Amino acid sequence: MVACCHRAPVVHRRSSESEEVGPAVVLGFSIALIVFSLLLMLLVLMHKGKGGGLSDMFGGGMQSSVGGSSVAERNLDRITVVVGLAWFACIMVLGLLMKANN
């Protein structure tokens, strides 16, 4: 009994060819990083000063209320965290793309 196995030829690609990413993807993530950076700066500047920091030295601490945070402040906190996480993820992806292109 003769065992005959015909396999399809295996084509090996170089790892650099399979990992290269087009410049449009890098440009897209770079633009997203700029947008997230500007949005994050705006959101951080919209927060009220909590006191005890640099905002206290320049008069920002006098405006903070004694009561709890309002719904708008809590939503601003949540939006800031989400934009911050998106900013961080964008930086990580850009770093991996730059490493893959080298």
Curated annotation (Swiss-Prot):
Main location: membrane
Classification via Pfam families: SecG
Superkingdom as given in the UniProt entry: Bacteria
A Gene Ontology BP annotation from the UniProt entry: protein secretion
Keyword Membrane tagged: yes
Record function comment: Involved in protein export. Participates in an early event of protein translocation.
Family from the record: Belongs to the SecG family.
Membrane topology: Multi-pass membrane protein
Molecular-function annotations in GO: protein-transporting ATPase activity
Protein location: Cell membrane
GO cellular component: plasma membrane
Transmembrane segments: 25-45, 79-99
Keywords tagged on the record: Cell membrane, Membrane, Protein transport, Translocation, Transmembrane, Transmembrane helix, Transport
Coiled-coil features, chain-numbered ranges: none
Organism: Streptomyces coelicolor (strain ATCC BAA-471 / A3(2) / M145)
Name of protein: Protein-export membrane protein SecG
